[in-house]
């Protein structure tokens, strides 16, 4: 059967179910609600970002794709959740943000240092200095989309500063 005939349920972990009493949802909270999710007739669970992040954009500003953010649990919690989903015949879809990273991601940090490293073209740089902004676009965070603390001073677009 095609995914077109399936029920997809999106979970934003931060607000779904808190398992440890800190007031924020987490992966273990999702695991505790698997029976409820299954009862809804769900086939696929689409989980919003939970990777390590400075949380300036609610997890969409990933700083490490290999680690679950401590806010949501651990890599072991993710493995257990996936096992429980499989046991319940549920499929997991991970909202993997690959169009951009946090300014705290090692790739970005290296890319902004110099034009001569392997990450130099992994981000869009304007080629102009900080006094010649490409346009006046604002981000949803209210700041210019391309401000840069970088020695390169030519970033064309990035997430807001986590400072």
Give the ranges of each region predicted by the language model.
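Hydrophobic or amphipathic alpha-helical targeting/insertion segments
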Residues: 84-101
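Aromatic-lined carbohydrate-binding/catalytic grooves of carbohydrate-active enzymes
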Residues: 39-77, 102
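Conserved, mostly hydrophobic/aromatic
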Residues: 11, 37, 47, 65, ...
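Aromatic- and acidic-residue-enriched segments that line the glycan-binding/catalytic groove
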Residues: 57-64, 101-140
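Conserved small/polar residues in nucleotide/adenosyl-binding loops
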Residues: 146-153
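Structural preference for beta-strand elements that scaffold enzyme active sites
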Residues: 6-10, 44, 91-93
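Short, acidic/polar
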Residues: 25-36
């Amino acid at each position: 059967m095609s995914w077109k005939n399936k029920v997809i349920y999106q979970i934003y972990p931060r607000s779904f179910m808190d398992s440890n009493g800190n007031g924020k949802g987490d992966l273990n909270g999702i695991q505790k609600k698997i029976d409820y999710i299954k009862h809804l007739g769900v086939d696929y669970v689409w989980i919003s970002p939970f990777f390590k992040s400075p949380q300036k954009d609610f997890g969409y500003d990933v700083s490490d794709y290999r680690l679950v953010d401590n806010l949501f649990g651990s890599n072991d919690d993710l493995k257990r959740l996936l096992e429980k989903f499989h046991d319940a015949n549920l499929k997991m879809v991970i909202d993997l943000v690959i169009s951009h990273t946090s300014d705290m991601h090692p790739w970005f940090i290296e890319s902004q240092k110099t034009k001569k490293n392997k990450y130099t073209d992994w981000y869009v740089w304007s080629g102009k200095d900080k006094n010649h902004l490409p346009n006046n676009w604002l981000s949803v965070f209210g700041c210019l989309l391309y401000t840069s603390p970088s020695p390169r001073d030519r970033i064309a677009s990035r997430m807001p500063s986590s400072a």
